[in-house]
Amino acid sequence: MSLTADPPACTVPAAGVSSTHKLVNGGAEKIVFKIKSSNNNEYRIAPVFGFVDPSGSKDVVITRTAGAPKEDKLVVHFASAPADATDAQAAFVAVAPAGTVTIPMSATA
């Protein structure tokens, strides 16, 4: 089971903008994920919970609101999804995370 982010980092202007990234499942199992941010005041993430099909990808939109330039990060926690799962948030609570992917975020002036 493997999950990667493309692009692997996010650099945005501190004045605010959105950036789209793909979570790519390189394995043969469906993955459930949850995204945590080190800065919930200036970043919005959609979706926070989700599934990535085997050999598939899922778009994640990172939106930066206006604020002071600084370094932050997103951490994507992931695990194999239960076979019958349809609700990502409920499924994620029911499994133990198997790995993480860190996406460094940089807001520049």
From Swiss-Prot:
It holds the Pfam family Motile_Sperm. Expressed at higher level in testis. InterPro entries: Ig-like_fold, MSP_dom, PapD-like_sf, Sperm-specific_class_P. Gene3D superfamilies: Immunoglobulins. PROSITE patterns: MSP. Residues 1-109 form the MSP domain. One of its GO terms (molecular function) is protein homodimerization activity. PANTHER family: MAJOR SPERM PROTEIN (PTHR22947), MSP DOMAIN-CONTAINING PROTEIN-RELATED (PTHR22947:SF7). Monomer. This is Sperm-specific class P protein 19. It comes from Caenorhabditis elegans.
